[in-house]
Amino acid sequence: MNSLLMITACLALVGTVWAKEGYLVNSYTGCKYECFKLGDNDYCLRECKQQYGKGAGGYCYAFGCWCTHLYEQAVVWPLKNKTCNGK
């Protein structure tokens, strides 16, 4: 019983440590969501949570919204076959 509990705890920890991160992307244009206030940013946090769920976090990194704590299948920038108007 203790072994099963330890295995379950380890699997939960691995899922937390290896959570996906990436730039928030507009699926129609392929462009990143831009931001100008670097670091903690209410806009990025709100947009990341809206697109990826309440567990997601977000902040402004290199003038783009960077989302954290995403599920593994989350779609992030860059998108295949989407060039963001050549940018």
Swiss-Prot record:
Expressed by the venom gland. CDD domains: neurotoxins_LC_scorpion. Residues 20-85 form the LCN-type CS-alpha/beta domain. One of its GO terms (cellular component) is extracellular region. It comes from the Eukaryota. The modification Asparagine amide is found at N85. The keyword Signal applies. Coiled coil: none annotated. InterPro entries: LCN-type_CS_alpha_beta_dom, Scorpion_toxin-like, Scorpion_toxin-like_sf, Scorpion_toxinL. Residues 1-19 form the signal peptide. This is Beta-toxin Cn4. The lineage of its organism: Eukaryota, Metazoa, Ecdysozoa, Arthropoda, Chelicerata.
